[in-house]
Amino acid sequence: MIERGKFRSLTLVNWNGFFARTFDLDALVTTLSGGNGAGKSTTMAAFITALIPDLTLLHFRNTTEAGATSGSRDKGLHGKLRAGVCYSALEVVNSRHQRVLVGVRLQQIAGRDRKVDIKPFMIQGLPVKVTPTEILTMTMGDRQARVLPLQELKERVEAIEGVLFKQFNSITDYHSLMFDLGVVPRRLRSSADRSKYYRLIEASLYGGISSAITRSLRDYLLPENSGVRKAFQDMEAALRENRLTLEAIRVTQSDRDLFKHLISEATAYVAADYMRHANERRLHLDDALTLRRDVFGSRKQLASEQYRHVDMARELAEISGGESDLETDYQAASDHLNLVQTAMRQQEKIGRYQEDLEELAFRLEEQNEVVAQSAEQQQENEARLEAAELEVDELKSQLADYQQALDVQQTRAIQFQQALQALDRARELCSLPAMTWEDAAPTLAIYKEREQEATERLLGFEQKLNIAEAASSRFEQAYGLVVKIAGQVSRSDAWQTARELIRDAASQRHQAERLQALRSQLNELEQRLREQQDAERLLQEFCQRMGQDYPPEELDVVQQELEARVETLSATVSEAGERRLALRQTLEQVTARIEQLTARALAWLAAQDALTALSEQSGEALTSSRQVTDTMQLLLERERETTVERDEVAGRKRCIEAQIERLSQPGGTDDARLTTLAERFGGVLLSEIYDDVTLDNAPYFSALYGPSHHAIVVPDLSRVREQLDGLEDCPDDLYLIEGDPQSFDDNVFGVEELEGAVLVKVADRQWRYSRFPAVPLFGRAARESRLENLSAERDVLAERYATLSFDVQKIQRQHQAFSRFIGAHLAVAFEPDPEAEMRTLNGRRGELERELSDHHGQNQQSRQHYDQAREGLQLLNRLIPRLGVLLDDTLQDRLETVQADWHDAQEAARYLSQHQKALDQLEPLVAVLQSDPEQHEQLRADYEQAQQTQRQVRQQAFALTEVVQRRTHFSYSDSAGMLSENTDLNDKLRQRLERAEAERSQARDALHAHQAQLTQFSQVQASLKSSYDAKQDMLKELMQELHDIGVQVDANAEARARERRDQLHMALSQNRGRRNQLEKQLTFCEAEMDALQKKLRKLERDYYQTREQVVSAKAGWCSVLRLVKENGVERRLHRRELAYMEAEDLRSMSDKALGALRLAVADNEHLRDVLRLSEDLKRPERKIQFFIAVYQHLRERIRQDIIRTDDPVEAIEQMEIELNRLTEELTAREQKLAISSKSVANIIRKTIQREQNRIRMLNQGLQAVSFGQVKSVRLNVSVREAHATLLDVLSEQQEQHQDLFSSQRLTFSEALAKLYQRLNPQIDLRQRTPQTVGEELLDYRNYLEIEVEVNRGADGWLRAESGALSTGEAIGTGMSILVIVVQSWEEESSRLRGKDISPCRLLFLDEAARLDAKSIATLFELCDRLQMQLIIAAPENISPEKGTTYKLVRKVFNNQEHVHVVGLLGFGTEQAAPPSTALTETDS
C-alpha cells in the first residue's frame, strides 16, 4: 500500500514572538496549548500562509470577528510579522519519501496600508541533517543569528550539491508543483480553485458548519464531467462543420465553371499588369541608370568650371569680407580722427583753463598773504587795545582807591593798612618777604630794568616768529605743488619726493622729445606688417589650393615644378579621343547580339514553365526527353498500386468504426435491448455497477464474469421469473444475477485467481477457465482507453485514406500533364538557355558603359588637375615679389618694441603737458621743504613764555610802584601833609589815566580801521577762492570728458589720424577695384557655365523625374512583391514570356480580362468591391490583393480540408471526382454523429447514479462519527423535480418534441434549452442564451441537490444547521464534512496525479475548548482512520492524551517579546515521553 505523505514540521522565522522556531508536527494531531495571546493563532496563520500565499484570500480574524465583513486593515497578517525578512516554511515528506521544503518569504511594506510582500519558494533534496532553521538563518555568534534574504538563501542552497531551489513568480505554479509532490489534495488551476481550498481551510480553522461550503457542496463534492460536456461540444461542432461542408460542396458544384473562368481571367488580368509593371520598372531603372551616368558626366564636366568659379567666388568673398573689414577700419579711422580733433579742442580748453587757474592761484596766494598780514596786524591791534584797556582799568582802580583814601583820611589806620597790604602784595609778587617799604624804590628800579629786558626779549621772539610764519606760507605752497603732482605724500617725505619729481621731469622731457620720431617709425613698421600679412594670406591660399603646406624658402622650387606639371597635364588631356571611340564600337556589337537572343527566348520560356511544373509534380529532375517518357510510364504503375492500397485502408476503417460504435453505447453493450430489459426488471446492468472499475482491475473482472459481463443485476430473481414468460425482444443469451445493486460484491462465484487468468467454479461440476484479455473492455475506464486507441487508429486510417485518394487523383493529373508536354514543348525544352547568354552580354554591356563613364571621369579629373595647377602658378607669381617681407621674422617684435616706446613717450608728453607749470614753480621752492614749519612750535612756545614773563615782571613792577607810591602812608606825620601828598598822587594818577585813555582810544580807532580793511581783504580772498574753485571744477569736468573720449593726443596726433584715414581710404578704393574686376570675371564665368548648367538641369530633371517614378513605384512594388511572396502566388503571376511583350499589348490583355471579371463577380459583393479598388492605376498592389482575394474566395468555397491542395487551380481539377465521394461520406458521417435525446438522458442518468453511489460510499465513512448529541452525519443527494421531468421526457416522450431535435437551425444544446423552457414555463431564464442554458443542462451537477443531515438525539435525521446544534456539535459536524470533501478531492484528482503519490491530509481547528473530551477523542479517531493530520489550538487547561502538544507561553524580557515553547508527546501513550525541551527565541 502506498504510504501517505505527511507534514513533518512548520518553521517560523522572525514572526511576532518567534525568531526561529520549528514545530515538529505529529503524524495525527498536533496541539498548540497556551493562554490568550500565546501565539497559537500566529502559528496557524504561518502554516496557512505557506499553504495558500494569496493576499486576496488571506484574512486571519479572531472569533470575535467571525461574520464581520471587514476586519483590521492588514487582515491579520501584517501585525503578526516583525520588521525585516520573515519566513514560513513547511517540511513535507511525500509518498516517494522525498523531503521537500515549501514556504514563503514575507516582508512588511512601509505605509499606511500595512501591506505585506510574499514570495513563494521551494527547496528539494535538502539533507536530513540540515534543519529548516539552519538553512533560513545564519549564526552570527553564541546567542545571535541573522535572517537570510531570499537571494542569499538561494545562493546558499544552490551551493549545496544535489539541492534544488526554485522561486515562483505566480501562485498557480507554486500550487501546481505542490500538487505534483502530493502536498495539496487537488490541482488549484485558478483563483476560484484557490478560493475553494481557502474557504475549506478557513471553515476548518474557525469551526462550525460553514454556510459558504454547505451552499456549494455540489462544487466541492461533485467532479465536473468535462469529458461528457466536451463530447457533446465536439459532436455539435462536428455536426455543424459537417453541415457547413455539405452546403459548401453543393455551392461549389454549382459554381465550379464560374471558378474556372474566374481564376483564368483573374490570372490574365493580374499577371499582365504585374509583368507590365515589372517591365516598366526595369525600363525605368535602365533609363534612370543611363540618366544618372549622363548626370554624373555633366557634373564632372561642370566641376572644373565650378572649381574656378568657387575659387573666384571664394576670393571675391574674401575680398568682400576684406572690404567690409576695410570699411569698418576706415569708418573707425574717421571716427578716431573726429575723436582726436575733439580731444585736441578739449585739450586747448583745458590749457586755457589751466592758465586761468594758475593766474587765479597766484593772485589767491598773494591775497592770502595780504589777508594773513592784515590778520596779524589785527591781532597786534587787539593786543595793544587789550593792554591799553588793562592799564586804564588799573589806573582807574588805583585812582578809585586813592579817592577812597582821601574820602576817609580820617581813618589813617585804614590807609596805613592799605599801605601794608600793598607792601605784602609786592613782597608776594616779587617773592621778597623781607623787603621793607624803604627798599621798594631800589627794588622798583631793578624791576623796571627787568621789565625793559623782558620787553626787548619779547620783541625779539616776535620778530623771529614773524619770520617763521613767512617761511611757513612758502612751505605750504611747495608742499601743495608736490601733492598736486605726485598725489598724497607725507610732509616728512615731501622734500625727497620733490627731488625725485624734478629728476623724473628731465627724463620725461627726453622721452617726449622722441614722440614724433617714434610715430614715424611705428607707421613704417605697421605698413610692412600689413604687407607681410597680405603675403601670408596669399601663401595660405596657395597652400590650400595645392592641398599641401610649403615653406616660403621653397617657393622658387615649387614654381619650377608647377610649370613642368602644367606642361605634362596639358599633354595628358589631349590623349582621350581614341580610347572612347573603340569602346563605343564594342558596345554596339554587344547590343545587337542581345536583340537576337531576345527573339528566341519566348518559346524556350514557355517550354521551361511546363517542364518546371512537371518536375514539381513528379519530384524528379527532368534533364532529357528520355527521362520524361520514363517518368510517365512510372506514373501509370504508381496509380495502380495506390488504388489497391486505398481500397484496403477503406475496409479497415469501416471495421474500426463499427467497434467504436459498439463501445460508445452506455455500459459498453452492443445490444440496446439490455438497457430496456434492465429498466423493465428494475435492475442494473452489471457493466454499470462495475463502470468505475480501474483500468488495472478491468482484466480481472472481465475474465471473472466472462460471457456474463453484460448480465442484469436484480434484487430478487423470483420477481423476474414471471416476466420471462413470453419474453421475445431479448438477446439469445440473457444473464440474470441476484444481488443488491447498491452494495453488490463479487462473491457470486467461487473464484481462484491464477497467473494471468481466473478459474471460475460455476457449479460443482462446471468450471470456467478465462484468461485476462489483452484489451479489456469491462468498466468505463477500460472502454474509454480502448475508445481512445480506436479513435486514434481511425483518425490515422481516415487521414491515410484521404491521402491515398488524393494521390490517385494527383497521379492522374500528372499523367495528363506529361502527355500535353510531350505534344507541345518537348522539341525546344532541352535547348541551351538564351537568357543565360543574355545575362552575360548584359553584364558585358554594363562593364563597357562603366568603362566609358570611368574614362570620361578620368579625363575630367586630369583637366581639373591642369586648371588647379595653372591657378596655383598664377598665385605663386603674385607671391614671389613679396618673399622678402614674408621671411622677415623680427618684424612683429620690432613693431611691439616701437609701440611700447611710443606709448611711453606719449605718456611722458601727457604727463608734462599736465604738470609742467607745477614743476617749474616747484623747482625754486625745493629747498623750503627741507624744514617743516610745524617743527618751530618751540619758537612760538618761547615767545609765549617771554610774553608771560614780561606780563609777570610788569605786574611786579606795578606792585612795587604801588608800594613806592604808598610809602607816604607809612608815615603819618600829620594829616595835612598826608592829604597833600595824596593830592599830588591823585593828580599824577589822573594824568596817567588820561594818557592811558588817549592811547586806548587811538588803539580802538586803529583796530576799527584795520578791521574794515581786513574785511575788505577777506571779501577779495573769498571772491578769488570761489572763482578758483569754479574753474578748478570746470577743469576736472574737461579732464573727465577728455578721459571719456579715450584718446591720448599730442601735437602730431591729428596728423597721424588723418594719415591713417587716408591710407585706409586708398586701400578701400583698391579693394573695391579688385572686387569689381572679380565680379566681372565671375559674370563671364557664369555665362560660360550657363550652357553646361542648362544641360545638367535638363538631365537632372529627367533623372529625378525617372528616379521619382522608380522610387514612388518602389514602395508599391515592394508591397506587391511582399504580397506575392507571402501568399505564394509568384509562380502564377511571374510569367516570363510576358516580359517580352509590349506594354500596350499587356495593357490590352489586362483590360479584356477586366471586362470579363466584372461580369464574373457581379453577384459577389466582396470580390466586386476588391475588383473596383484594383482598377486604381496608382495602387498596383490592389490587383495582387484582388488575385489573393480570388484565391482566398476559392479556398473558402472549395473547402481546403476536403480537397487537400494549396492551389485552387489544382483543387478545381480535383473537384469533379472528389465532390461526389465527399457528399456520400459526409452524409453517412452525419447519421453516425447524430445522437438521440434518449441516449443523452441515459448518459446523464447513469452519471447521476454513479455520483449517488459515490456519495453513499462517502457516507459510510461518516456513520461512526458522533459529537455530543449527534450520533451520525450523512450527505443526502436528490434530483431536482424540474430536471427529473426533463430526463423523463427525453427518454420516453422524445417523439413529441422532434421539432426541436430535428431542426437544422438548432444545435442539440439549444434544442435542450428550448425543451426545458417548454416544460417549465414558470422558470425565468433571464438574459441567458439558449446555448448557455443548454450547456448547463448537459452538466449533471445542475440536476442534483446535496444537503448535510445529522442524527441528533430524539429528533432523528434533520438538516444540519448551526442554529439547531451546539457549538461543539457544529464544529464536529463541519469538520466531518470537510474531511469528506478532502477525501472526495483526492479521489477526483487521482487520475491527474502520479500513481505513487498519496497526498497529505491536514486540517485545522482553533479554540478547541468548545469541544468536550469525547468529541476530541472522536476527532483523534477520525484522523487515525483517515490518516489525516490535525492542528488544534486549545487553552492551557486542555492536554490531549494523544499526539504532540506544544505549551506556548509569551514572555517579555528586556523589552523583547518572545514565546517560550515546550513540546510534549501525549502522556496517554505507552511510549515514554521525550524530555521536555524549551527553546527561547531572543531577537538580535
Swiss-Prot record:
Q: Which GO cellular component terms are attached?
A: cytoplasm; nucleoid
What Pfam families does this protein's entry cite? Answer: MukB (PF04310), MukB_hinge (PF16330), SbcC_Walker_B (PF13558)
User: Is the Ribonucleoprotein keyword given for this protein?
Assistant: no
Assigned keywords, A-Z: ATP-binding, Cell cycle, Cell division, Chromosome partition, Coiled coil, Cytoplasm, DNA condensation, DNA-binding, Nucleotide-binding
Protein's UniProt keywords contain Oxidoreductase: no
Subcellular location per UniProt equals: Cytoplasm, Nucleoid
Provide the residue span(s) of the region labelled Flexible hinge: 666-783
Q: What is its main location?
A: cytoplasm
Q: Which GO terms describe its molecular function?
A: ATP binding; DNA binding
Binding residues for ATP, per the UniProt record?
Answer: G34, G35, N36, G37, A38, G39, K40, S41
**Which parts of the chain are coiled coil?**
338-415, 496-604, 781-805, 835-868, 903-1115, 1206-1265
Question: Some GO term, biological process aspect, for this entry: which one?
Answer: chromosome segregation
The job of this chain, per UniProt, is described as: Plays a central role in chromosome condensation, segregation and cell cycle progression. Functions as a homodimer, which is essential for chromosome partition. Involved in negative DNA supercoiling in vivo, and by this means organize and compact chromosomes. May achieve or facilitate chromosome segregation by condensation DNA from both sides of a centrally located replisome during cell division.
The entry's free-text remark on domains says: The hinge domain, which separates the large intramolecular coiled coil regions, allows the homodimerization, forming a V-shaped homodimer.
By sequence similarity, the record places it as follows: Belongs to the SMC family. MukB subfamily.
Q: How does this protein assemble?
A: Homodimerization via its hinge domain. Binds to DNA via its C-terminal region. Interacts, and probably forms a ternary complex, with MukE and MukF via its C-terminal region. The complex formation is stimulated by calcium or magnesium. Interacts with tubulin-related protein FtsZ.
The protein's name: Chromosome partition protein MukB
In its UniProt entry, the species of origin is given as Sodalis glossinidius (strain morsitans)
